[in-house]
């Protein structure tokens, strides 16, 4: 047996001397409370992080850009507004030539508002909550115009926590209407109560069927049109086309049907799109003027916060987007957002934004301004706003 100790006891008789006992387990209740507290802390952190990202998110830095495709179609003689005997014929293409998206001169595919960069991906935390809400048809649509600054406006609006927008252009009301509203709705992001669903497709403004189709979806849809001096818009359109197809004819040769006679070729989409008054007429047959907002592409560059204030009021949103969200990029000459959506870093959208335009002869610019002047004045009258292009 074991060694005897004083008092006649063996070492085996002394509890815990050579065989230490494990500590008693913690009470089950205490263990459960600790686990519950840890889970609560993790959930609270994720919730606050998601909220912070939603409230401070800003879209990728926006630069108003240039360029698009050139198209030609068989002309049809039309007269300029307020002129009984036009100095030069206005030849419009067939009804669907602008909306078809087929470019005989430079190939298919809208380049302007099919942004060269995909929108920023949502953060993992935001994705955790992406299953909330439901998909709704858009309550507001940016319908035009191409190369006017629609991508800039949409990205600026995405700073607002109550605006949810589709990143790519759906082209539903001009190219995919046959797929039905259920297909269209499925393209939309999920929204919560109080949030607005938006999309932008600039070609809608020059698509004759679009006004009736959007009205059939909802007569209450709010429409936003970003417009820009039609001469600089046409040059911007051409500039982007030139970057994709360096072998296309010169701007001057595409502008005129007969250079010596000074006849403008309005079958070229770069010229046709700038006839804003003509394109606005069918929209006013389906929507009251009060449901349309006309945004200045020039002021979107010089005073983005001012134009965004008008847009937020039009959409019934709280004025959250202000001067503090923007800074001016001296290199490109355009405003940018201080924070990209889903991150805290500034970012300018698109390396092609702010690129130099080709030099156009002064005489060509003068003839174009003379051509557009009556259409511009008619547009000012129709919208109640002088954009100062003349």
UniProtKB/Swiss-Prot annotation:
Subcellular location(s) of the protein: Golgi apparatus membrane
Glycosylated residues (UniProt): 82, 258, 329
Domain of life from the UniProt record: Eukaryota
Enzyme kind, highest EC tier: transferase
GO terms assigned for molecular function: [heparan sulfate]-glucosamine 3-sulfotransferase activity
Parts of the chain that traverse the membrane: 33-53
Topology in the lipid bilayer: Single-pass type II membrane protein
E.C. code: 2.8.2.30
Lumenal side: 54-390
SS bonds (residue pairs): 336-348
Binding site for substrate: 169-175, 200-203, 268-269
Chain positions recorded as 3'-phosphoadenylyl sulfate binding sites: 147-151, 228, 236, 353-357
Pfam families: Sulfotransfer_1
GO cellular component: Golgi membrane; plasma membrane
Stretches for region Disordered: 1-25, 79-125
GO biological process: branching involved in ureteric bud morphogenesis; glycosaminoglycan biosynthetic process; heparan sulfate proteoglycan biosynthetic process
InterPro entries: NST/OST, P-loop_NTPase, Sulfotransferase_dom
Protein function: Sulfotransferase that utilizes 3'-phospho-5'-adenylyl sulfate (PAPS) to catalyze the transfer of a sulfo group to an N-unsubstituted glucosamine linked to a 2-O-sulfo iduronic acid unit on heparan sulfate. Catalyzes the O-sulfation of glucosamine in IdoUA2S-GlcNS and also in IdoUA2S-GlcNH2. Unlike HS3ST1/3-OST-1, does not convert non-anticoagulant heparan sulfate to anticoagulant heparan sulfate.
Stored PANTHER family: HEPARAN SULFATE GLUCOSAMINE 3-O-SULFOTRANSFERASE 3B1, HEPARAN SULFATE SULFOTRANSFERASE
Similarity comment text for this entry: Belongs to the sulfotransferase 1 family.
Protein name as annotated: Heparan sulfate glucosamine 3-O-sulfotransferase 3B1
Top-level taxonomy: Eukaryota, Metazoa, Chordata, Craniata, Vertebrata
């Amino acid at each position: 047996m074991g060694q005897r100790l004083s008092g006649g006891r063996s070492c085996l008789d002394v509890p815990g001397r050579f065989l230490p006992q494990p500590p008693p387990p913690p009470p089950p209740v205490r263990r459960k409370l600790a686990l519950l507290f840890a889970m609560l802390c993790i959930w609270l952190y994720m919730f606050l992080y998601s909220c912070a990202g939603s409230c401070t998110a800003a879209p990728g830095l926006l630069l108003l850009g240039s360029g698009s495709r050139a198209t030609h179609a068989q002309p049809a003689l039309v007269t300029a507004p307020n002129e009984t005997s036009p100095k030069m014929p206005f030849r419009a293409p067939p009804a669907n030539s602008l909306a078809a998206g087929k470019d005989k001169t430079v190939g298919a595919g809208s380049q302007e508002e099919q942004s060269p960069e995909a929108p920023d991906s949502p953060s993992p935390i935001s994705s955790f909550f992406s299953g909330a809400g439901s998909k709704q048809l858009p309550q507001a649509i940016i319908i035009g115009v191409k190369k006017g600054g629609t991508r800039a406006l949409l990205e600026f609006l995405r700073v607002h926590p109550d605006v949810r927008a589709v990143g790519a252009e759906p082209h539903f009301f001009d190219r995919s209407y046959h797929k039905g509203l259920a297909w269209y709705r499925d393209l939309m992001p999920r929204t919560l109560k109080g949030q607005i669903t938006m999309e932008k497709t600039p070609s809608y403004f020059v698509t004759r069927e679009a006004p009736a189709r959007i009205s059939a979806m909802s007569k209450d849809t709010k429409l936003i049109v970003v417009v820009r001096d039609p001469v600089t818009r046409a040059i911007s359109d051409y500039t982007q086309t030139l970057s994709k197809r360096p072998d296309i004819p010169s701007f001057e040769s595409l502008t005129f049907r007969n250079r010596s006679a000074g006849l403008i070729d309005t079958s070229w989409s770069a010229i046709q799109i700038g006839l804003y008054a003509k394109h606005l007429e069918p929209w006013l047959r389906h929507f009251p003027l009060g449901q349309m907002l006309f945004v200045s592409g020039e002021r979107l560059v010089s005073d983005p916060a001012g134009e965004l204030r008008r847009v937020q009021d039009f959409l019934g949103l709280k004025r959250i987007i202000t001067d503090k969200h923007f800074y001016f990029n001296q290199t490109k000459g355009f405003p940018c957002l201080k924070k990209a959506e889903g991150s805290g870093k500034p970012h300018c959208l698109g390396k092609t934004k702010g690129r130099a335009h080709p030099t156009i002869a002064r005489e060509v610019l003068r003839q174009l301004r003379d051509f557009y002047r009556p259409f511009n004045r008619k547009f000012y009258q129709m919208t109640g706003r002088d954009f100062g292009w003349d």
